[in-house]
Amino acid sequence: MYSKEMTEVKSRCLGAFVGLAIGDALGAPVEFRRRGMFTPVTGMRAGGTFGLPSGAWTDDTAMALCLADSLLHNPEFDVVDLLERFCDWMLTGTNTSTGKSIGIGQNTLRTLGNYRRTGETTAIKGGKRSDGNGAIMRLAAVPCMHWQNVEKARSIAIAQSQCTHHSPLSEGCCDLMTFILCQLISGKIWEQILPYPNKNNWLEEVSLLSS
């Protein structure tokens, strides 16, 4: 690949990952608040449920950094390494913006606790309790690492979801988002990506997103 093309790819990867953190920091002060109950977000601000300083990120970016660190350690995906990093974040505040883990969801707390007790690396299927967006919020590093091998990226995206959010909806959304990000990183535009045929037996809700 020509150096100019690779520079553009690196820029898109940077945009995907840094954009994740910026969006997280922008939304943190109004997280859990209903639409219309706060002034429009036009810049970084402090406060919110967790009393964070302006520009601070939440558990979503912290876990994204854990996933990125794990993939740098083993690009093929090491589930034990990832879960150990998640536990380190939960217990010691690694990869947080304030030195203390905040915002951990009940589903993630439950599954990491189960891993520490039993060594089980796959979250218990919890129905709608496992349908949260935690797994998709953190996955940017997967397409950034494996955008040239879309099937591998999609497989890892599903596997990392199963660590904490083991449900067809969460896994399908991670699969679809990773496919989209891989295509965008490679230089394709929306019109070349969607609609995408449902080849993976996604739930109807996920299929609607891809149409």
Identify the residue ranges that each predicted region occupies.
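Structured, active/binding-site neighborhoods that engage oxygen-rich ligands
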Residues: M1-S211
